[in-house]
């Protein structure tokens, strides 16, 4: 983290006092809340929209998720790569038990990228464009939580694309408020062991027993819908995913930069701090985030009706063939799953039964002890981007997120970092994270509050109002490191960056004024692509938070650490010269699989060129980056801890990495072959 412990200097006054030591111990008995955090039943009585919001004037922001793919490429422009955090075919990629929010997370990216008033329906008006999902970079949290321009996508045709959607506020109760916190968590002494084929919403690794397996938050009795109606989803992207604007000019969004840092020249200097192979002329385009912005064809687009008896004949013939094959495969799968079901009783625990079996999980719970004692996890990350599962509107009103699952996530996160970054305030996600920290008695854990900002004034006002409520309900606000108002709002503004920036700054000013009135001594910031930061935005923020993803620059894993350091130091660090403002890399990471990216507007000619997604490459980047960053005091957030399987829908033929950015799979298991450096025992503050 940026602070007095750096072994080098940026030659600017950005080295403020370190903040690790000013973390007040969490009162395990009293908790952080003046009042108990909201708690909810398994199923909210709200089955329809609480209200229909009218359109508000275009604000310059594109409604989108907090993460999406953005290209850091050799040429100017945005890459068409998209990032989904983790999706596994055949697994519960959409349910509340999956990391990132399942189907509820899908609503974020999809809903925000279209000119409709609500839900995934927006995808129907994209003129065939594939809009990438992103969390913080595109997508994250997050998540997601990073999305590149969709393949073949042109610029947005009209201001209609900026039109806000119907949304639901944080003031809407999620189920019965009096329900015990643990009641939301799927149950069983072991995490969900349901068959992966029981429901499309079952979590990855559901057949594996143990504390790293995600539980299904809903029973097989029909608590969770097997078919989602896109018309019922109105999402604002606060999970870190955002739609990526098409057609941004290469000249305005990507500029060639020297590769001195990537080289780690023998002469030393700032760039010599990160030793890696030289990357030639890397340029920066949009970087994929953690959101639903991932550019890909909408699953909701209806096929054009076919004509002709011959075509119908072929269809009927193929259908019969599929039925025969399906019967054979179904028999085999059924037998296998039947055996597994016999081996694992109590496979369909609901959230309420989890509470009955496990109560409100805490540090003394057996499965939590297992999660918090993994020798392969090391606390070497200054911060981690995180979006709880199932925190998207309005689906969370009917299917509330699970407190116990958040507690499990935080237990794992505590082995990696002392700082967690959130992307929004909807669905009581902040309260659940704080509750988990209290239950686990994590004295040093801190939280960066997140506020999602898009083109819908109602959404923005709701998010900010909930931010204020969280602060009012928190006894000891020293647990917070600050508030991040907006993630990649300028990136999502497309060509209307000027008006978007003006409105974003006005929201930041409003929050800052409120904090002054309440005597909250907390910094206000926003996060965006590294090359979207200019002096006027720096003036309005207390920190410069840049999303920097080497994978989308088309550089090799060996060049990645140097490229990241170089880009950040040449584009963002100089902006704070002569001030006491810190610079933070708000998102950086590498996918564990799914193809390769050769930079903005560059198509890879083979599968080994450019940035290759893979475990070996991920290990290479972490080996070069993590310990050196820890040693020289670089403050950054890693994207991300857990895969988000539901994002598989945003993968394309050549870009299948959207669901694979986590250090761990959706079941909280470290990916096979992945090695987190221990940095000689040194840990992040």
UniProtKB/Swiss-Prot annotation:
Transmembrane segments: 313-333
Swiss-Prot/TrEMBL keywords: Carbohydrate metabolism, Cell membrane, Cell wall biogenesis/degradation, Glycoprotein, Hydrolase, Membrane, Polysaccharide degradation, Signal-anchor, Transmembrane, Transmembrane helix
Keyword Glycoprotein listed: yes
A single cellular component GO annotation: extracellular region
Gene3D superfamilies: Glycosidases (3.20.20.80)
EC number of the protein: 3.2.1.39
Cellular localisation: Cell membrane
Cytoplasmic topological domain residue ranges: 1-312
Protein function: Glucanases play a role in cell expansion during growth, in cell-cell fusion during mating, and in spore release during sporulation. This enzyme may be involved in beta-glucan degradation. Active on laminarin and lichenan.
Name of the featured protein: Probable glucan endo-1,3-beta-glucosidase btgC
Organism, scientific name: Aspergillus oryzae (strain ATCC 42149 / RIB 40)
Phylogenetic lineage: Eukaryota, Fungi, Dikarya, Ascomycota, Pezizomycotina
Gene designation per UniProt: btgC
